[in-house]
């Protein structure tokens, strides 16, 4: 396993910074939440994130990002969470789509499919690694009636997840914990199941986060993950391929994108038995997973989806960038907000390119089990 320096746990400092930057904006959504940020603290987060992205793709550049994985990811989500919710909703992941199926329905089905493949039930205590603002957890809780603990390294997202759980009267089943998934503070063998939806990609080394998941799972417990990986078609030495991977990294707060084979080997190395693996982005679906970003209107299924697809399309993203730029100019939005939307635009363009060329998948599904006789 590649050697990575684990982050210092400065939880109180993180909490104070989140409070200074976000205040009570966790009770708001979208642009209104953005307008409620403390501008000086937002400037600190912007500088803290973009200092890592100057176009450098050398081994030294990558090592700096890998070593600063925790701060990089925290700053990223301090900056983009409100934009994500505005454009995409509270489940920060991609999905497969079928004709006649609305965007929100597809999102829920993608979450249900994972829970189904893992056989999650009401008697299980489940860990959601990298839980975001809790959208998938709320859906899986309703679907299975299980108890879920969400783990997140971003205080603002933890606050939002707690707020939503209480709002939707699920706080008896859902709880959220601040923590670094590379060094979890849970007791060993304390969960019946663990899942991660497009979250462990933020780990500097996949073997590191998978080993922590293995540790907290009970013997016989199941781990399910939708992993972001570069496919077998990706060539690290191909300049165009590397440009696409870098665009995904800078726009999505990822220290380094790894290939599929790295994820598979990492699971095996820590002791998991892989029971199921499938790239759900490579099954010849009529509607591609990236269509909302590509703005392919022919695939829009419902009237309500028109608003979502407009916001996520090239035209909608351009409108958002210009509006946010104007708000920043007149002091309604924090300094650097337009730079953030620019990074999200880079991400969208390269995610689509990676999807079209089948170089990248956001839904490499693994179902893996910790052996019953694990020590």
From Swiss-Prot:
- One GO cellular component term: endoplasmic reticulum
- UniProt pathway: Steroid metabolism; ergosterol biosynthesis; ergosterol from zymosterol: step 1/5
UniProt cross-references to Gene3D superfamilies, sorted A to Z: Vaccinia Virus protein VP39
Chemical reaction(s) catalysed: zymosterol + S-adenosyl-L-methionine = fecosterol + S-adenosyl-L-homocysteine + H(+)
Which cysteines does the record link by disulfide bonds? none
Q: What is its EC number?
A: 2.1.1.41
List this protein's GO terms for biological process. Answer: ergosterol biosynthetic process; methylation
Matches recorded under CDD domains: AdoMet_MTases
Q: Which keywords does UniProt give here? A: Lipid biosynthesis, Lipid metabolism, Methyltransferase, S-adenosyl-L-methionine, Steroid biosynthesis, Steroid metabolism, Sterol biosynthesis, Sterol metabolism, Transferase
What are the recorded GO MF terms, alphabetically?
A: sterol 24-C-methyltransferase activity
**Mind telling me which PANTHER family this protein's record contains?**
HYPOTHETICAL LOC100005854, ZGC:194242
The family line of this record is: Belongs to the class I-like SAM-binding methyltransferase superfamily. Erg6/SMT family.
This protein's name: Sterol 24-C-methyltransferase
Q: Which organism is it from?
A: Clavispora lusitaniae (strain ATCC 42720)
Q: Which gene encodes it?
A: ERG6
């Amino acid at each position: 396993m590649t050697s990575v320096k684990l982050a210092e746990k400065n939880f109180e400092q993180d909490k104070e910074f989140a409070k200074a930057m976000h205040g009570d904006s966790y009770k708001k959504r979208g642009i209104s939440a953005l307008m409620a940020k403390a501008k000086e603290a937002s400037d600190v987060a912007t500088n803290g994130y973009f200092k890592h992205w100057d176009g450098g793709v050398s081994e030294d550049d990558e090592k700096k990002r890998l070593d600063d994985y925790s701060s990089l990811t925290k700053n990223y989500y301090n900056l983009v969470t409100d934009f994500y919710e505005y454009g995409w909703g509270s489940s920060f992941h991609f999905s497969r789509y079928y004709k006649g199926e609305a965007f929100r329905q597809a999102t829920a089905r993608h979450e249900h499919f994972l829970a189904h493949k893992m056989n999650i039930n009401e008697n299980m205590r489940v860990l959601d690694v990298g839980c975001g603002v809790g959208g998938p957890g709320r859906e899986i809780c309703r679907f299975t009636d299980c108890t879920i603990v969400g783990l997140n390294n971003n205080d603002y997202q933890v606050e939002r997840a707690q707020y939503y759980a209480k709002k939707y009267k699920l706080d008896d089943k859902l709880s959220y914990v601040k923590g670094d998934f590379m060094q979890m503070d849970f007791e060993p063998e304390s969960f019946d199941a663990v899942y991660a939806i497009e979250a462990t990609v933020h780990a500097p080394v996949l073997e590191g986060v998978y080993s922590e998941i293995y540790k907290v799972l009970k013997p016989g417990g199941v781990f399910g993950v939708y992993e972001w990986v570069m496919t077998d078609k990706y060539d690290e030495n191909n300049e165009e391929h590397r440009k696409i991977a870098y665009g995904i990294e800078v726009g999505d707060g990822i220290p380094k994108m790894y290939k599929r084979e790295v994820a598979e080997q990492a699971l095996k190395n820590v002791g998991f038995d892989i029971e199921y693996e499938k790239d759900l982005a490579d099954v010849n679906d009529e509607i591609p997973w990236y269509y909302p970003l590509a703005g392919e209107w022919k695939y829009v299924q419902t009237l309500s989806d028109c608003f979502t697809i407009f916001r996520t399309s090239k035209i909608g993203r351009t409108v958002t960038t210009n509006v946010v730029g104007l708000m920043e100019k007149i002091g309604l939005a924090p300094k650097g907000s337009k730079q953030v939307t620019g990074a999200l635009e880079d991400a969208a363009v390269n995610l689509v390119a990676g999807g079209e060329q089948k170089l990248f998948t956001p839904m490499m599904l693994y179902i893996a089990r910790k052996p019953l006789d694990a020590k």
